[in-house]
């Protein structure tokens, strides 16, 4: 089974750190941020990893190589300057991801989401489900949330009455979900997901453990403290 780590972002809110270093390679407790994902994916049984990149992508390839240092095999999906957004990046990488459900992880989060359980979920994804998402409590920078999670584990696009949760950036997808996106085109993920939700094709679960969106310098410092204690 394959997993994809999204690593094509410019990291504007991290400047000037990201002017010379791509965000996935920023140090978090002695290890590049993306390295935490690679280690945990390997432990969970994901050994075929696809990584997309745009900004300073050559540095990512030079640092991670073929993945052997982490015990995995890495294939890269380069994108043009500016990137293709999340859905566009996944669509471009489909030839590397194969025909089975795959896991996608945002490269700029620090989390202890159970990737072993994710492996099992991907292996047994019901035929009528095209995506399975991990949702978390809303952080201060996203107080209203993104989607709502119903008692039957279905995920809905409407957020009403304070029932919203935040998408963690970790999800399992069927490749067919991206068939309508032409390779090389720019496309956001949220509209694709909302379309699938309206057809009752998205399930999810709430994660209550460690999750941090490492999107600012302040949160990078928080990640360094968390990861230092975590390891």
Swiss-Prot record:
Transferase recorded as keyword: yes
Pfam name, any one: NTP_transferase
Domain of life: Bacteria
Residues the record lists as binding Mg(2+): 108, 213
Residues annotated as binding substrate: 106, 146, 213
Residues holding UTP: 11-13, 23
Single GO term (MF): metal ion binding
Cofactor(s), names only, from the UniProt record: Mg(2+)
Catalysis performed (reactions): N-acetyl-alpha-D-muramate 1-phosphate + UDP + H(+) = UDP-N-acetyl-alpha-D-muramate + phosphate
Assembly: Monomer.
Protein name from the UniProt record: N-acetylmuramate alpha-1-phosphate uridylyltransferase
Organism: Neisseria meningitidis serogroup B (strain ATCC BAA-335 / MC58)
Name of encoding gene: murU
